């Protein structure tokens, strides 16, 4: 690519001596060479810093920021985002491996498509022994796909995070213009919150190829803090659903078992809204006779027989009747 713009790659590392050499080497060996590599050592107590100092001697593009104390992942990430210089910034985890063409393929696409604010890719899975709950669902070499186009990504965000944070490359001007940060109020799912906000500022996209290898092991956030991550993700999902409902003219502050009662007649052709209602009926914070009667009167006809049976069975199991 001619006139290659500077890309800043930000890596946060805490006690990552086992993986950090391979991770940083995969960035150094990118086919795209105009890089600024910022590594935040978050008060590691193992040999992470020593490894970083040795590898930085081999490549002047590497800048090490070392926190005196462990400040946590979100704080460290925001420190890195506060001092990068590139036209684009990328994120990668200290235990993952970028394929050589990761940055070149995405930046080339972004340079040709000005309307896209940020772009990621599929992931290739690496499963290690004792890799926790998520690892049991995959095997090494599996490809973790996500929607490719903005509208499909936004629709998926109502129900889960369709963005692989460690593959994303974003335009710096949008990040700076809107003074974005990774929010500490959303621990263990801060990336889901961040990309939900970015999706309302510009177009997101995913490259249809696995450009980063994602390592599953027992010490990562999704394994150690799986319950907390799920609870935070549930909070973000409800915020995203509320935003969508407000956007289509349904005035609800927070979607829950009470506000669900404010949704009456629904356009059967709106597949997204039907999916939202089904999701909410299957995950109410409180199941009551009132909610059941509302479902039967207004929403029963929206769903097929299988979905209706699942919802009714959920009410039967969960309903709280005060005698």
Curated annotation (Swiss-Prot):
Give the enzyme's main class according to its UniProt record, as a single word. Answer: transferase
Protein name, UniProt field: Uncharacterized glycosyltransferase HI_1578
Look up keyword Secreted and say if it applies: no
Q: Which InterPro entries match?
A: Glyco_trans_2-like (IPR001173), Glycosyltransf_2 (IPR050834), Nucleotide-diphossugar_trans (IPR029044)
Entry keyword Cell inner membrane: no
Q: Which UniProt keywords apply?
A: Glycosyltransferase, Transferase
Which molecular function term from Gene Ontology is one that the record holds? glycosyltransferase activity
- EC number annotated for this UniProt entry: 2.4.-.-
Q: What family does this belong to?
A: Belongs to the glycosyltransferase 2 family.
Report which superkingdom the organism of origin falls in: Bacteria
A Pfam family that the UniProt record links to this protein: Glycos_transf_2
The organism is Haemophilus influenzae (strain ATCC 51907 / DSM 11121 / KW20 / Rd)
């Amino acid at each position: 690519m001619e006139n290659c713009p500077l890309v800043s790659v930000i890596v946060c590392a805490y006690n990552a001596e086992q993986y950090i050499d391979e991770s940083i080497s995969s960035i150094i060996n990118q086919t795209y060479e105009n890089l600024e590599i910022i590594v935040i050592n978050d008060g590691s107590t193992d040999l992470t810093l020593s490894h970083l100092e040795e590898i930085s001697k081999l490549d002047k593009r590497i800048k090490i920021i070392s926190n005196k104390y462990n400040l946590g992942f979100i704080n460290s990430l925001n420190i890195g985002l506060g001092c990068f210089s590139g036209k684009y910034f990328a994120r990668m985890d200290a235990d993952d491996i970028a394929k050589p063409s990761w940055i070149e393929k995405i930046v080339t696409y972004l340079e040709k498509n000005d309307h896209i604010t940020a772009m990621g890719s599929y992931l290739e899975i690496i499963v290690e022994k004792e890799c926790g709950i998520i690892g049991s669902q995959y095997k090494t070499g599996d490809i973790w796909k996500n929607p490719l186009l903005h509208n499909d990504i936004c629709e998926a965000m109502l129900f889960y995070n369709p963005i692989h944070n460690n593959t994303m490359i974003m335009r710096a001007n949008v990040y700076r213009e809107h003074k974005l940060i990774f929010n500490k109020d959303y621990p263990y799912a801060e990336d889901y919150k961040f990309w939900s906000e970015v999706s309302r500022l510009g177009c997101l996209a995913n490259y249809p190829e696995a450009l980063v290898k994602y390592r599953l092991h027992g010490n990562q956030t999704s394994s150690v803090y799986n319950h907390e991550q799920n609870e935070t993700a549930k909070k973000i999902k409800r915020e995203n659903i509320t935003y969508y409902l407000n956007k289509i003219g349904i005035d609800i502050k927070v979607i829950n078992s009470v506000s669900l009662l404010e949704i009456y007649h629904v356009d059967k052709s709106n597949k997204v809204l039907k999916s939202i209602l089904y999701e909410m009926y299957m995950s109410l914070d409180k199941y009551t006779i009132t909610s059941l009667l509302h479902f039967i009167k207004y929403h029963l006809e929206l769903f097929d027989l299988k979905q209706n049976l699942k919802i009714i069975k959920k009410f039967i199991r969960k309903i709280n009747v005060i005698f």
